[in-house]
């Protein structure tokens, strides 16, 4: 699936844009603040319902406008799909697919699997466990049809359980929530464990190519003790949870621990090496999706040249080309991306929110 056309209205500093896109590489070149990252963010938002630079909707809608509008056309092997997203200052969204309203953002996410690589993306490696849970959950979402519903129900039940912890005095009063929570937690943890095991070889192979000087290991931690039933953990920790007023163990505490030569990667790798590792993990995830389902990711890469020397940029470019996926790359100068260009690529110039090709 590739995005063949993108229409943007009143998004960030872009008043209006209508872009015909390449199914291969698309380059966005312009000075800092020109709006090139806003194009990437518009694509991301079309597939996620939210921006990646700000959760405040008022900062995403163009100044003095009431809403932004995004439309796209997705070309699959057999058919074309029209998609659209409108979001106003109150945060209300309208999703349209093939001319009909009433769709969910999750449907857009399923139609547009994408990998985002930005200068802020180091949080996957040096941020808290929630960023690595999100990495695993992306894979589970695209590989397990029941994951999104189970994950949504888990979040709801945990919120209700945490509220109940402020009021109950005996564990028996929590059993109605735990009766629903326990099977969901175990299923989600099983999916995450299976996904992390399935993608392990892809991550190891890609990391070996990108960072041959290190031995990288990946370890899934489910969020409670090994070989202990979740029901037992919840009951045993009731008094502690009640004092904390939240559930201290469970899939919401899971992590994917990543080590280089036995030490945490954030303590061992340079910024350039961390970026390579981040790219390697995103590539591995996209390649795993293609192998398992035949679907390809869109890759969004902001500030391609930062942290990478010429050799490493060349390595990343060659691996991206090998995926045969659609790729969007922003750069300050065309010199940073010209070597990646071929007869099927498109080069866009961005200046003060105006986009030309």
Curated annotation (Swiss-Prot):
<comment type="similarity">
    <text>Belongs to the RecF family.</text>
</comment>
<keyword id="KW-0234">DNA repair</keyword>
<dbReference type="InterPro" id="IPR003395">
    <property type="entry name" value="RecF/RecN/SMC_N"/>
</dbReference>
<keyword id="KW-0067">ATP-binding</keyword>
<keyword id="KW-0238">DNA-binding</keyword>
<dbReference type="GO" id="GO:0006260">
    <property type="term" value="P:DNA replication"/>
</dbReference>
<comment type="function">
    <text>The RecF protein is involved in DNA metabolism; it is required for DNA replication and normal SOS inducibility. RecF binds preferentially to single-stranded, linear DNA. It also seems to bind ATP.</text>
</comment>
<dbReference type="GO" id="GO:0006302">
    <property type="term" value="P:double-strand break repair"/>
</dbReference>
<dbReference type="InterPro" id="IPR018078">
    <property type="entry name" value="DNA-binding_RecF_CS"/>
</dbReference>
<dbReference type="Pfam" id="PF02463">
    <property type="entry name" value="SMC_N"/>
</dbReference>
<feature type="binding site">
    <location>
        <begin position="30"/>
        <end position="37"/>
    </location>
    <ligand>
        <name>ATP</name>
    </ligand>
</feature>
<dbReference type="InterPro" id="IPR042174">
    <property type="entry name" value="RecF_2"/>
</dbReference>
<dbReference type="GO" id="GO:0005737">
    <property type="term" value="C:cytoplasm"/>
</dbReference>
<keyword id="KW-0547">Nucleotide-binding</keyword>
<protein>
    <recommendedName>
        <fullName>DNA replication and repair protein RecF</fullName>
    </recommendedName>
</protein>
<dbReference type="GO" id="GO:0009432">
    <property type="term" value="P:SOS response"/>
</dbReference>
<keyword id="KW-0235">DNA replication</keyword>
<dbReference type="GO" id="GO:0003697">
    <property type="term" value="F:single-stranded DNA binding"/>
</dbReference>
<keyword id="KW-0742">SOS response</keyword>
<dbReference type="InterPro" id="IPR001238">
    <property type="entry name" value="DNA-binding_RecF"/>
</dbReference>
<keyword id="KW-0227">DNA damage</keyword>
<dbReference type="GO" id="GO:0000731">
    <property type="term" value="P:DNA synthesis involved in DNA repair"/>
</dbReference>
<keyword id="KW-0963">Cytoplasm</keyword>
<dbReference type="GO" id="GO:0005524">
    <property type="term" value="F:ATP binding"/>
</dbReference>
<dbReference type="InterPro" id="IPR027417">
    <property type="entry name" value="P-loop_NTPase"/>
</dbReference>
